């Protein structure tokens, strides 16, 4: 059971067994055009999930108009500005939500800034799994700030 509340997302394990989770959200943001975007608060390197290689984040984001799927180990913040819509969007996603994915799917004029607790296949390999003890809860926090630049 998942619930989104002002104080975060609460995942409740109502079983008699410890439960592993890998959790992510997929907020989509409408954009004016890919060429009008400026990204910041990102690490130097990222994982191109399509090719499964480590790459320079800025080099990859320069190809956002072609479609990207980038996983980043962030500082807990991911941001972009849309110069035409005159807005700045900041995803605040502290540990354990500090993995970030930037995803685009042209020609749709949108991007996703996604907070994740662990990368793909983590339920298989156990990397960064969160274990919720029997009859316990886990609270995850993330927020989105949208600032007008007018």
Language-model segments: residues:
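Acidic, contiguous internal or C-terminal segments within carbohydrate-active enzymes
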Residues: 1-21, 25-27
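A short, structured loop/turn motif at beta-sheet edges
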Residues: 1-3, 31-33, 83-84, 104-108, ...
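Intrinsic-disorder/low-complexity, polar/charged segments enriched in Ser/Thr/Lys/Arg/Asp/Glu/Gln
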Residues: 4-8, 77, 86, 137-141
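Short coil/turn motifs at secondary-structure junctions
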Residues: 14-16, 32, 118-120, 147-149
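Active-site/ligand-binding surface loops and adjacent short beta/alpha elements
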Residues: 17-20, 27-94
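Surface-exposed, gly/pro-biased binding rims or lids
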Residues: 43-51, 114-132
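Glycine-rich active-site loops that engage anionic ligands at enzyme catalytic sites
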Residues: 82-120
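Short Pro-Gly-centered flexible turn/kink motifs
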Residues: 131-148
């Amino acid at each position: 059971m998942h619930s989104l509340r002002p104080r975060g997302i609460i995942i409740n394990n109502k079983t008699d067994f410890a439960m592993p989770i890998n959790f992510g959200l997929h907020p989509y943001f409408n954009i004016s055009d890919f060429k009008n975007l400026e990204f910041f608060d990102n690490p130097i390197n990222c994982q191109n999930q399509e090719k499964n290689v480590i790459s320079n984040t800025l080099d990859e984001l320069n190809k956002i108009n072609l479609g990207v799927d980038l996983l980043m180990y962030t500082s807990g913040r991911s941001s972009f500005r849309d110069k035409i819509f005159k807005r700045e969007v900041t995803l605040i996603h502290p540990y354990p939500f500090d993995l970030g994915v930037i995803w685009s799917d042209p020609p749709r004029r949108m991007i996703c800034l996604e907070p994740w607790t662990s990368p793909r296949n983590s339920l298989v390999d156990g990397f960064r799994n969160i274990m919720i003890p029997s009859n316990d809860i886990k609270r995850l926090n993330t927020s989105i700030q949208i600032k007008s630049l007018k």
